[in-house]
Amino acid sequence: MWPWLERIASACWDRVRRYALTRRDEEDGSGSGGDADDLLLWSRDLVRHAAGEFSFAVVQANDVLEDHSQVETGAAATFIGVYDGHGGAEASRFISNHLAAHLVRLAQERGTISEDIVRNAFSATEEGFLSLVRRTHLIKPSIASIGSCCLVGIIWKGTLYLANLGDSRAVVGCLTGSNKIVAEQLTRDHNASMEEVRQELRSLHPDDSQIVVLKNGVWRIKGIIQVSRSIGDAYLKKQEFALDPSMTRFHLSEPLRRPVLTSEPSIYTRVLHSQDSFFIFASDGLWEHLTNQQAVEIVHNNPREGIARRLVKAALKEAARKREMKYNDIKKLEKGVRRFFHDDITVVVVFIDHELLQDGDESTPEISVRGFVDSGGPSSFSGLNGIS
């Protein structure tokens, strides 16, 4: 077959295949509209941002949703935040209410966005939450044990700024010349299951033989927590927030000599390339059940509409399969009970339309979309329109 004819045939077949997949999903209830009876699954599609569109989905497993998340759109910039809380929702909720505002304030003061500004926004958020802990821990000691992972992406002037604490993850789907999609992980997982993280902790704490402990087949810091970086978790950062023996799960047998967790984010900068098709931002509940490559292939091979929801459901189906169950069985379970089968999961898929990235789109709606909240509000990122 002539090369030009082969390319046309391939493109036509790709469209037919995608249509068939969509029809199949509509018929078997696995598409975005076929699971209205899963009351713990929320989604929002498709919303414009300055350089394309995004799809957003959250499923609740815990009795109280510990994942908080947001997308802020403006004519000049787009902000994506995924905050996977643990021990409670206070830290993830606090981040959702303050981090983007700190970033906008600092960017306006400096007249730009940079790695330092992102780092300082994280620092201000950590300081603010620790101040809250200091004011309330005598009344509610457990707040010292509450923390959150924090994954943030900012798209501004053709560049993606990424910052990460914990094991939420950002992955890019890159198109090859043969129209194949390849996953590239952009963030590092700060989790004690990773050998490099254990080595880092041991080098920072050479006098502490219990800095990482293998407990019931899982590596944990001080035998308690898996993530090595977070907002909050004050009891593992400052001795003043040590918890007494009555809270056995979080009690340390010896006084804290130095912080064992840090709030210093890993920061990455990526100039967007023409082959960067989309980005997936997700809490670890997704990555527990799907590989990076599986996730990008699902996005690449299906319509944009409902794609974040589709990813969440793919993870839930895999979680069900591991327990020799079906997704239909899991979605009938109540919140709290579902946590025995899967975690809270947040997914934001951000599509990049490179024509918009180059030319800009001043008509982009400036809105704030929050996970599991149906109504949108004004975006704080409208304040970035004037910076150069």
Swiss-Prot record:
Supply the InterPro entries for this chain: PP2C, PP2C_BS, PPM-type-like_dom_sf, PPM-type_phosphatase-like_dom
Catalytic reaction equation(s): O-phospho-L-seryl-[protein] + H2O = L-seryl-[protein] + phosphate; O-phospho-L-threonyl-[protein] + H2O = L-threonyl-[protein] + phosphate
Q: Which domain of life is it from?
A: Eukaryota
List required co-factors. Mg(2+); Mn(2+)
Which amino acid positions bind Mn(2+) 2, per UniProt?
A: D84, D284, D343
EC nos: 3.1.3.16
Which positions does UniProt annotate for Mn(2+) 1 binding? D84, G85
Q: Which organism is it from?
A: Oryza sativa subsp. japonica (Rice)
CDD domains noted in UniProt: PP2Cc (cd00143)
Pfam families, per the entry: PP2C
Q: Write the protein's name.
A: Probable protein phosphatase 2C 43
Which residue range or ranges hold the PPM-type phosphatase domain? 53-352
